[in-house]
């Protein structure tokens, strides 16, 4: 029984299946962890969702910002952009089933035995684990409810960007969503910076990657995350695993086998893919 952690798939279905074949992933025996952003940019978002859903209890995933954006497009709140290549999914006969399943997925995964935590963007250093769990449940409860379109309409925005237990209402939910799905850099006090997307070496002072600021979760748990392709899986402290290696931008899809910390890599097919949404970062 092995545990495989894979970074952002972004609709790269062929690469996902090739990587799982490479590691001899066996559903029912092994467990697959996915860092979120299952969809958008790559050509196979529909196939990715169908496959991941079919795995049942053999998969543990978290929602990413592109997954949430897909839900907003599906409900008519956001525009379907051609570069995201979501039209086959949105027009599929099982779209309702797939997206209602997707919105009921978590923002946070925790394995106490392995001392492993996973979130799409990471864990803000302003939170301890009980706070992170409570915050994840707050957003998950809204997404699972009939009022989820109201939340999706209000989730866009960069403020508030500083955690306080006193945050309430939509501001609280927006901060939680940004921390779990969009965070990269923080100010030294842990306050989120929602604008910088470059590599850590190019970031303006005093910004630091969230994982470079000491926080209570990282003291006791390993943290796996995706979202930040420009890291190229490098430059994180011991126990912090950056798994997004930019498959949808022509990089690769990366898998970490947890038990022996061995990495497996599947190169992107995007150099073969010159259609709408080709591998050019925006």
UniProtKB/Swiss-Prot annotation:
GO MF annotation, one: bis(5'-nucleosyl)-tetraphosphatase (symmetrical) activity
Spans traversing the lipid bilayer: none
Enzyme Commission number, as recorded: 3.6.1.41
CDD domains documented for this protein: MPP_ApaH
Keyword Hydrolase attributed: yes
Record keywords, A-Z: Hydrolase
InterPro entries: ApaH, Calcineurin-like_PHP_ApaH, Metallo-depent_PP-like
Reactions that this protein is recorded to catalyse: P(1),P(4)-bis(5'-adenosyl) tetraphosphate + H2O = 2 ADP + 2 H(+)
Hydrolase listed as a keyword: yes
HAMAP family: ApaH (MF_00199)
Function according to Swiss-Prot or TrEMBL: Hydrolyzes diadenosine 5',5'''-P1,P4-tetraphosphate to yield ADP.
Family (UniProt): Belongs to the Ap4A hydrolase family.
Protein name: Bis(5'-nucleosyl)-tetraphosphatase, symmetrical
Source organism per UniProt: Shigella dysenteriae serotype 1 (strain Sd197)
